[in-house]
Amino acid sequence: MTSTDTQRDVVELLLEARQVVSLAESLAHQSCTTETRELAQHVSDVVEWVLPLHCADEDESVTSRLTGRNTVVDAALTQMRREHLALDAPMARVRLLCRMVARDVSRLHALRFELEAAATDLRARLERHQTFEESAVIPALKRLLFADELTAIADEMRARRQSLAA
């Protein structure tokens, strides 16, 4: 695998959280069916583990390798950690609403607007966060880390996901 392929793998794994919000937004526009209940359960499950994995990837694998290499990058890493903490409540809100729909799909009618608002809020926060990461953290990964370090990050990220699949 080339260094560019490894960089792409790391970046793609860091950006996978975007897919979660699209699922939550689509859920708000569904009919009350068994498939909708299953989608709500799926979104709840994914929010419960994908976004925390994203934070763990950055906090455990990325930050540990970038800290101390550049003062501007150190400040960006501090901001990134703060943003992760600020995502906890919006994620919990989406997860709770999806669980409520998964338990009783007929509640979707009553929760539709709240779910859409929660998903929209989470999307806006994630987009700001990911825009920041794409402008500050990801370029630092590419600029400051060697190929073997990027490979180690990608391996750690995959291992976190494999432990969930097991």
Locations of regions flagged by a protein language model:
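Small-residue-biased structural context
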Residues: M1-A166
